[in-house]
Design a protein with these regions (language model features):
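Active-/binding-site microenvironments in catalytic and ligand-binding cores
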Residues: 1-124
């Protein structure tokens, strides 16, 4: 069971491809949106997480939605419930399955809908 108020971090293993842009993103060509290929979460997973009252969803890929998404339904589903997303997370394999305290420190950007963020996990 996922307790309400949790941050759920999705470890796809995709972080192992960083910093190789071609492997991490599916393409090394800037602006090649059609070439993007990486995993993300689906709308059903986003709905389940929202229903369980999570506060945040993080992932070790470039986006919460899969690479070729055109509608960004996972983003929209989570953000409609005021659940924030954390992308491009590193070292998820070093975290325990539960019990870590997550601290996300975003850069302040006036009027922005997103920002670079430093994420720190305190281990139990």
């Amino acid at each position: 069971r996922i307790p309400a108020g949790s941050a759920v971090l999705v470890r796809t293993g995709w972080g192992r491809y960083w910093p190789d842009r071609a492997r991490y993103l599916g393409t090394a060509k800037p602006g090649d949106v059609a070439g993007l290929r990486f995993p993300g979460i689906g709308v059903e997973a986003a709905k389940v997480l929202a229903a369980r009252g999570v506060r945040a969803v993080g992932i070790d890929t470039a986006s919460i939605d899969y690479g070729r998404s055109k509608d960004f339904i996972a983003h929209r589903t989570l953000y409609a419930e005021n659940i924030y997303g954390l992308e491009n997370l590193a070292n998820l394999e070093k975290l325990p399955p539960r019990g870590a305290t997550l601290i996300a420190l975003p850069m302040k950007i006036a009027g922005g809908s997103g920002a670079p963020v430093r994420v720190v996990a305190l281990l139990p």
